[in-house]
Design a protein with these regions (language model features):
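Glycine-rich phosphate/adenosyl-contacting loop at the front of the ribokinase-like
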Residues: 1-59, 64-68, 74-75, 93
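Secondary-structure boundary/capping motif
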Residues: 2-3, 79-81, 127
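Residue-level detector of anion-binding/catalytic polar loops
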Residues: 53, 79, 103
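Short glycine-rich, polar/acidic loop-and-turn segments at beta strand-coil junctions
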Residues: 58-62, 84, 98
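A glycine-rich helix N-cap at a beta->alpha junction
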Residues: 72-87
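Conserved phosphate-binding/catalytic loop of the ribokinase/pfkB sugar-kinase fold
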Residues: 85, 95-131
Length: 131
């Protein structure tokens, strides 16, 4: 059986949602959630849930968020055999939403996946052509 190799981002999503009218320039009460995200990781997880053997080639930091993503991939059945451990922090997306779920602001730190160079993928050429 063939497998799919996904090359893409994996990051931790931090979402803050105001429980009332958002007031700028101050702390607002609300709920904060943390979840595994990233377009590449999301695609890989959904393929694995469909029963497709899936490997994710991504860049993770050697930090707590990297551990969260490694655990989430393991639980979803997504292989990380070729994941690269970077000096950068694991990708993080921080979003602040209004009570209605409208975007107020967001910040992303994708320096880990942005550090991926084509030369780092050359060693996977044979596997990529067989996937």
């Amino acid at each position: 059986m063939h497998r799919v190799i996904v090359i893409g981002g994996a990051n931790v999503d931090i979402e803050g949602r105001s429980s009332g009218a958002f007031i700028g320039g101050t702390s607002n009460p609300g709920d904060v959630t943390l979840s595994a995200g990233g377009v590449g990781r999301n695609i890989a997880e959904n393929l694995a849930r469909l029963g497709v053997a899936t490997e994710l080639v991504t860049v993770l930091g050697n930090d707590p968020n990297g551990l969260i993503l490694r655990d989430a991939c393991a639980k979803a059945g997504v292989g990380l055999t070729h994941a690269i451990t970077a000096k950068h922090a694991t990708g993080t997306y921080l979003v602040v939403l209004s009570k209605k779920g409208e975007l107020i602001s967001a910040i992303n730190d994708m320096s880990a996946i942005e550090s991926l160079k084509p030369q780092q993928l050359e060693s996977l050429a044979d596997e990529l052509t067989q996937a």
